[in-house]
Structure formats: structure tokens, C-alpha cells
């Protein structure tokens, strides 16, 4: 059984709400009389990445996942989808220094809303070289008997409440690290992934040429595996090989402990992950997922996947979830500093 999910300042995702505007620190050196010695204020020392990773709070991850699953369904065709949109905006809007934007699209008459949290350096970021961490927040239960997307529950705790919760926690952690950033980090909460990544593909299609992104890192369905702390590392074309290698190195460098971490080359959009449209367009892109493929000796299959039974109690490997969250954030921070 398959176990996996399944598109300058960018033309501006439509501004939906804005937290406090990114501040510009005053110059450290001011004019002074010739007889006065002026001492520059040293730049704050960046917190080591290993220390930043320890700020990820497993309890907060769990709280967000449980809240997202409690809405019943986040399927874009279900009226409860709006509750998830409101929750994400409320949580992000409560974090000082985070700028929220939205990008709206439609697929076969189904409205989609992508939500972005911009984490900027304290000085204006460059127009290119941005780093995206993305997760889809929609859900589906099409493997359940009698499935009707407008009324059937689709709690999506593992797929992809785990990845969405990680992005919310990144926003909290990264808002305190802006002084160490040289590049903008964009946390992208994509809609319509379960419709074959329609939200991310639409956003990609809205980007200018050249697009602003240097890398896309996708975290999707990372909370179940009773056998091993395994992740599949999906990468796209040779243009993503260096990013793939950076993820592998980060797992070792910060002693995160994902084992095994298994690279898989994706050559088509058949990998229904939000990294796919970006990677196939030539943007360095990877995705981490608990398994993309059939069951094997390190993954037994997830029977709750895409059913009404993907509930919080099925997210049983919190250790793997935390490791996936750390690995994703470590890679993004290395790129953005």
C-alpha cells in the first residue's frame, strides 16, 4: 500500500494580514565629536543551529496537530476547511515579526487558499535566494467507504497535520532568529495538494521569471512508523542533488538520528507532493515523508492513510516527527544564514 500524500517578491501573494512590519535596526555607528571614541555595537551572535533545533517544542507540535484534526475535515470541498484557514491565520498572526500573505486559486471551481508566513532578516531581504519550507494543510479520506468530500470526515492527523504543525512551530522559533538570517524564509501552507498539488502548482505559475526561490523543502506525513525512525528523501532532477546531499549531511552534522534516510529520485509529477512542481521546474527541491512506496522491512504501511481513521491517536512515532521537524529546519537555516 502506498503511504504518501497525494503548482517576487512573488507576484504578491495577496496580502491577507500583516503582523508587525519587519524592523530595520538603527545604524550602530553614529556621528560624534572628534574627541569622542565611537564603538560600534557588535552584531548579535547567531544562536548555533543545534541550539535552535532544541527550541522546537514537541508539546506545541502535538497541540497544533490535534487542533487541525479536530475540524473534522480540511478537504477544500468541505465547509470545515474554512476553520483550518482561520486557525492558521490566527496562530501566525499572534507571532510578532511574522508577515502573513495569501495566494488564491481555483481548480474545477473549487477555491483554494495558500497561506504564507514570511520570516525576514532585520534588513530588507534580497529579491532572490529565498528558502521555502512547505506543507499542505488540506486533507482527504478517499480510501474510506462511501466517501463524499463535502461531508465525510478527513481528520488528516498524520497526513498532513504533522507537517502543518511543524510549520506553525517553525514560525514561532524562527521569529526569534531573524537577526541571524541573510535570506527570507517562506513558510508555505499549501492547499489542494490532495487534488494533485493544485495549490502549489498554481502558486508556482504565478511567480516571476526569475523566480525568487533558491530551494524548496517539503515536510509531509511524518508521524507514523512503529518499526524505525525512517524517512524517504524525495529529490527532483539533478538540479536538486546538492540540496539532497545537504539534507543528508545535516542529519549527520546535528546528530538528528533519522535512520534510515533513503533518497528517492522522482522523475515525474506522479509523486504527489508539493515539492514536485517546483523540482520539476528546475528549482532545487526535496521532500521528506515517512514512506513513499510500498511497505518494506522498515515501514509496515499506514492503514489510516487517506481514511476517516487518520486521527491523532494514529500519530504514534513522536520521535520520528520531531526528527523530521529538526532535519527540515536545520537544512533551511543553513541555506538562509
Regions found by a protein language model. Name each.
Residues 226-337:
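Active-site-adjacent substrate-binding region
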Amino acid at each position: 500500500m502506498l503511504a504518501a500524500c497525494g503548482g517576487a517578491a512573488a507576484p504578491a501573494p495577496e496580502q491577507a494580514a500583516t503582523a508587525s512590519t519587519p524592523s530595520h535596526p538603527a545604524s550602530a555607528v553614529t556621528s560624534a565629536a572628534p574627541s569622542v571614541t565611537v564603538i560600534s555595537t557588535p552584531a548579535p551572535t547567531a544562536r548555533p543551529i543545534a541550539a535552535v533545533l532544541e527550541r522546537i517544542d514537541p508539546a506545541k507540535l502535538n497541540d497544533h496537530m490535534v487542533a487541525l484534526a479536530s475540524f473534522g475535515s480540511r478537504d477544500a470541498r468541505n465547509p470545515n476547511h474554512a476553520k483550518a484557514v482561520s486557525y492558521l491565520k490566527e496562530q501566525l498572526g499572534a507571532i510578532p515579526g511574522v508577515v502573513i500573505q495569501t495566494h488564491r486559486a481555483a481548480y474545477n471551481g473549487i477555491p483554494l487558499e495558500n497561506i504564507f508566513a514570511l520570516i525576514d532578516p532585520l534588513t530588507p531581504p534580497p529579491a532572490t535566494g529565498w528558502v521555502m519550507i512547505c506543507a499542505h494543510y488540506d486533507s482527504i479520506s478517499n480510501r474510506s467507504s462511501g466517501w463524499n468530500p463535502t461531508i465525510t470526515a478527513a481528520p488528516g492527523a498524520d497526513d498532513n497535520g504533522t507537517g502543518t504543525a511543524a510549520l506553525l512551530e517553525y514560525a514561532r522559533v524562527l521569529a526569534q532568529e531573524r537577526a541571524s538570517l541573510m535570506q527570507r524564509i517562506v513558510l508555505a501552507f499549501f492547499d489542494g495538494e490532495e487534488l494533485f498539488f493544485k495549490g502549489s502548482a498554481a502558486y508556482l505559475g504565478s511567480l516571476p521569471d526569475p523566480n525568487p526561490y533558491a530551494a524548496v523543502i517539503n515536510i509531509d506525513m511524518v508521524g507514523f512508523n512503529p518499526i524505525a525512525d525512517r524517512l524517504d528523501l524525495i529529490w527532483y532532477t539533478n538540479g536538486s542533488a546538492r540540496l539532497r546531499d545537504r539534507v543528508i549531511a545535516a542529519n549527520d552534522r546535528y546528530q538528528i538520528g533519522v535512520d534510515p534516510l533513503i533518497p528517492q529520485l522522482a522523475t515525474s509529477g506522479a509523486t504527489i507532493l508539493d515539492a514536485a512542481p517546483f523540482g520539476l521546474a528546475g528549482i532545487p527541491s526535496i521532500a521528506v515523508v515517512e514512506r513513499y512506496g510500498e511497505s518494506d522491512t522498515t515501514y509496515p504501511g499506514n492503514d489510516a492513510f487517506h481514511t476517516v481513521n487518520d486521527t491523532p491517536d494514529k500519530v504514534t512515532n513522536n520521535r520520528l516527527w520531531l526528527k523530521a521537524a529538526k532535519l527540515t529546519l536545520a537544512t533551511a537555516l543553513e541555506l538562509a544564514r
